[in-house]
Amino acid sequence: MRILRVPTDFRVVEQFDEAMLSRQGEHLVYSVSSRGLNTAESAARLADAAGVPMDSVSYAGQKPKEGVAGQVFSVHGGEPISMRGFEFVARRIGVADRPVQASDITGNAYEIVVRDLQGDDMRRLRHNMAQVRDGGLPSYFDDQR
């Protein structure tokens, strides 16, 4: 069995509570999809594009460089932006009167591709996935924790 053979074999997307969005605010809120970039690198791209210092960019959680990540950022001040490229897409989803923070994320959705299953792998995988479904799984990846 092989996991994470190619970058798109791992996807994680933050589940965002849109209740923090407001009708007015100084913080522009973006949905960002990145590939091959960690959270700090994505934040730097947003800061550069908006013309603001890095400390004007906030995010709820750390995402790894490996794989494809979907996460929410807020930018205090600066120019509204929209970016679309192979490894980075930023789309404004609203405004807020405060920066995005960890409590704005209700969880993460994962997609992990498993390749080259052999023998008893599928039976074990189904058994283990049932345990994950029933009990959850802590998220320990890269330098997050």
Please provide the spans of the model-predicted regions.
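Ser/Thr-Pro-rich, acidic low-complexity intrinsically disordered regions of eukaryotic RNA-binding
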Residues: 39-45
